[in-house]
C-alpha cells in the first residue's frame, strides 16, 4: 500500500492503464471503518487508501471519470466520520454564550487531560475526515465541469462540516470551498468566452 501511494503521488499518470483494478481495491480498503468505534489501524489504512485515491485524481483527472461520482459520494460520507464525538449544535451555542460571560477562569479545563492535551488526542479518525475532504478538493480543482453537480448535491453537507472540531480538517474544508469558487469562476469564464466566439462568428 505504501509503495502504491508513493507511485501515485510521484508518477500517478503511469497507473492509468490499471485503474480498473486499483480504484475498487482502494475503495474497499477505505470502507473497513466501524461506525461505533474509532480504531487507529483502520483509520491509518483508510487514510493511506484515500490519500492514494486523491493523488490518482490529481494525476489522472480524465481517466478516473467513471469513478468520480462514487468517490465523491463516499468522501462526503467519510468527511463526517467521527464516532468518538457527538456534535450538538444547541450545546455548542450554550458553550459559546458561557465563554462570553465568564472571565476566562478555568477555561476549557473539562476538555483537557492532566497533561494539558485534549482528552481525545489519541483519536485518529480526523485523518480519515481530512483525507476524504482532500479527495473532494482534488475533484473540484481538476474537474471544474463537476463542480456544479457537487454544489447542487452536497453544498449543505460541506457547509455543515464547517463545525469540524479539528483545525487540520477545517483548513482542508476551507481550502475546498476556495477550490469550488475558483473552479466555478473558471467555468463561467470559459462559457463566456465560448458565447463571445459564437456571437462573433454570426
Language-model region placement:
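Karyopherin-beta/Importin-beta family HEAT-repeat alpha-solenoid scaffold
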Residues: 1-202
